[in-house]
C-alpha cells in the first residue's frame, strides 16, 4: 500500500468508525421507553428495565469474542452483520407482546449486536493510528456517547409523532443504514510490526499469555471498578437526587444531563491527555476524581450543588476510563491482539452493570453499594500507582538466538 493510499484508507476507516459508533451508542436512550413499554405489556417498570441489564451483559459478552470474529470474517463483514442484527432486534422489540420476547429482542439480541460492532470497530481504528491512540479512542468512544444524546432527540420526537412500535422500526432502520454505510468505509488494520527499543522486544501478547500476567488482572479490577461505579450511579442518579439530596422531580431529572456532559468530558479530556502523559497516570487521575465524588455521596451533606458535582466526578472517570483503557491495554500487551486482550477485560462492563444493583437489592438502600464502590476505588488506586508493565524480552547479539 502506497503512503497516500495508507493515509486515505485510515482516515476513511476513522470516519466509518465514528458513524458506526454514533449509531451503536443510540442504545443508551433506552430509559425513554420504559414507561411506554410498561404500559403496553402491563408489566412493572423494573421488569421492563431489566432488558437494559441484559443488553449491557450481552454487549460485554459479544465484545469479548470480537477479535476472533474479525480474524475470521474481517471488520467490514462483522460490522455489517452487527448493523443488520441491531435493526432486526429493534424490529422484533416493536412487535414484542410479552416480557420474555422483550428480554430476548431488546436485551439479548440488541446487546450482542451492539457489542460485536462496538469493540471491533474501536480496536481496529486504534490500530490504524498507533501514534495517536488516545486521541482516536476519544473520537470513537466520544461519538458513541454522542449517539445517546443525538438519538435522544430523534427517539423523543418519533415517540410523540408515530408512537412506540413505529419508533422502534424507524430507529432500527436508521441505525442499520448508518452502521452498514460506516462499515463500507472500513478496512482491517495492517498487522503491527514488532518494535525494538534499546535492545528490548516490544512483545505482542496472546490472550493466553496476557492472562498469565498479574498486570492483566490488576487492569481488570481497575476497569470493573470504574464500570461498576459509573453504571450504578448513572442508573440510580434520579433516585439518589430525590431520596438523599431531596430534590424535586424536575431538578432530579437534570442528573441525566449532568451525567451526559461529564461522561463526554471525561472521554475527551482524559483521552486526549493520555497522549501527553503516561496512560496509567491518567487512570490514576480519574480514580482520584471518582473517589472524591463517591466520598461526597457518602460523607458530605447533599444538596443540589454537592450532588451534581459528586455524580459528575463519577461519570467523568467512567467516560475517561473506557476511553483510555483500549490504548492502555495495547501499551501493556501489544496492538495486534488488542480486540481479544481488551475483550475479556471488557466483560467487567457487563459484570459491573449488574453488581451494583445486586448489592443494593441484597442489602437495601444506596449506602452499602456506595461503601463497596468506595473500597474498590481505594484498591484500584493502589493498583494503578504500583502496577508496572510486563518485562519484555532482551535481544541477544549472538547469531540466531534470543
Curated annotation (Swiss-Prot):
Species per Swiss-Prot/TrEMBL record? Escherichia coli (strain K12)
Task: Write out the similarity annotation.
Answer: Belongs to the major facilitator superfamily.
Q: Which GO terms describe its cellular component?
A: plasma membrane
Which sequence ranges are listed under topological domain Cytoplasmic? 1-11, 67-72, 123-134, 187-216, 274-279, 330-341, 388-402
What is the name of the protein in this document? Uncharacterized MFS-type transporter YhjX
Q: What is its main location?
A: membrane
Residue ranges spanning the membrane: these are 12-34, 44-66, 73-95, 100-122, 135-154, 169-186, 217-236, 251-273, 280-302, 307-329, 342-364, 368-387
* General function of this protein: Part of a nutrient-sensing regulatory network composed of the two-component regulatory systems BtsS/BtsR and YpdA/YpdB, and their respective target proteins, BtsT and YhjX.
Give the record's GO biological process terms: cellular response to nutrient levels
Q: Name one GO molecular function term.
A: transmembrane transporter activity
Which InterPro entries does the UniProt record give?
Answer: MFS, MFS_dom, MFS_trans_sf, Oxa_For_antiport_fam_transptr, Proton-linked_MCT
What Gene3D superfamilies does UniProt report for this protein, alphabetically?
MFS general substrate transporter like domains
Side of membrane Periplasmic, spans: 35-43, 96-99, 155-168, 237-250, 303-306, 365-367
Induction of synthesis? Induced by the two-component regulatory system YpdA/YpdB in response to pyruvate. Regulated at post-transcriptional level by CsrA.
Keywords, A to Z, come to: Cell inner membrane, Cell membrane, Membrane, Transmembrane, Transmembrane helix, Transport
The record describes its quaternary structure and partners as: Interacts with BtsS and YpdA.
Transcription is among the record's keywords: no
Q: Where in the cell is it found?
A: Cell inner membrane
Protein's membrane topology = Multi-pass membrane protein
